[in-house]
Amino acid sequence: MLTIVFMAYSFCYIFILQSDMLAYLQHVLSEGHTTYNRLVGSLIVVFLVFIIHAAVSAITRLPEKLYAFTFLPSALFLAVLTDLIADYSLCKLLIYLAVLVLTVLLYIKTANSASSQRRKSDSTSVYISNVLILCVMMVVVGLCGNSNDKQHYELKMERLLNESKYEEAVKVGAKSLVSSERLTCLRAFALSKSGLLGEKMFEYPVTSTENALLIPRKDSTHMIFHPDNIYKYLGAFPGETSTSYQFLHLISSQPDLLKSRPQIKDYLLTTALLRKNLDLFASEIKRFYDFSDSTLVLPKHYGEALVLYSHLRTKPKVTYNNTLTETNYKDFVEFSEKYKDRLTRANAVRQHYGDTYWWFYYYGKVCK
């Protein structure tokens, strides 16, 4: 019974919680030449866990009340696989070696004690003792495994993008405040594939860096989603010295390419917004939209940016008239003025306007 419980736990732990981490590990070790299968990989790990337990159980003679300790090497294997191998450090290695040494010493002491005191144990106490020991082991394995939210979000999003599940990819980590440069790039790709980059980009946590929405091609060895997928989607590859904006501006200036790849426009405009360069954004957006059209309705974040721009500039290059957006901006300003402390204001405003470009412009960080 204990064996079935631990094997079921091992499968769920690997398949549900750590499969993306193992996929990344296999990708790195094979230099991208093999692909990880979640079901097959999980079954192989469970089989190895079972073999380790069976071997330990066969060569050890522990008292009945301590039988669950035969699962300790298997638990240690799971912890090492999902923590040490995936995220190596000397400190972690020393800790696991110490646990291994303590396990051997504990076995020697327990075995000697058992040989000198052999008596029948109550079946109920034996069962309870083993269940408690096994539960503690499973909890410890869960605590030891890689629990870096950022890394798990990135890997899960990469897997979903490889499977062309763009709507699911967008939702990864959506309710968390965790963000990174890579997460921002991956989510932008998923949103663009769904036609929502200008509409929803700033509804999620974003990290703005020099690369903006483009992942350097050299990062391919550390990703299961190849950066070239983004460049193929845009229809061109950047030069070694060009910045993300220079690259996007260049390809947006090619009429035929822009016509066949309209997503270039959104990448360019969103890049300007991520850099908080409203003047650049205003000069670029005029190339793509006819502002003489009174019925023009822009994607949400573009409209928010232009309303903000018109309030920050005495002579704006372009104006956008949208009553609803204008009203929302005034409410945003009035609400912000209620708080004097910047940190308190940022947190309070996030609760009501965290899904707007305005919040990012005033409180989001732009990394150099």
Predicted regions span which residues?
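Membrane-embedded alpha-helical segments of integral membrane proteins
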Residues: 64-118
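Hydrophobic membrane-targeting alpha-helices
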Residues: 51, 55, 59, 106-114, ...
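Aromatic-anchored segments of alpha-helical transmembrane domains
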Residues: 9-14, 72-83, 136-141
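Solvent-exposed soluble domains appended to multi-pass membrane proteins
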Residues: 234-368
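Internal/C-terminal transmembrane anchor helices
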Residues: 122-148
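Soluble catalytic regions of membrane-associated enzymes that act on cell-envelope
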Residues: 146-283
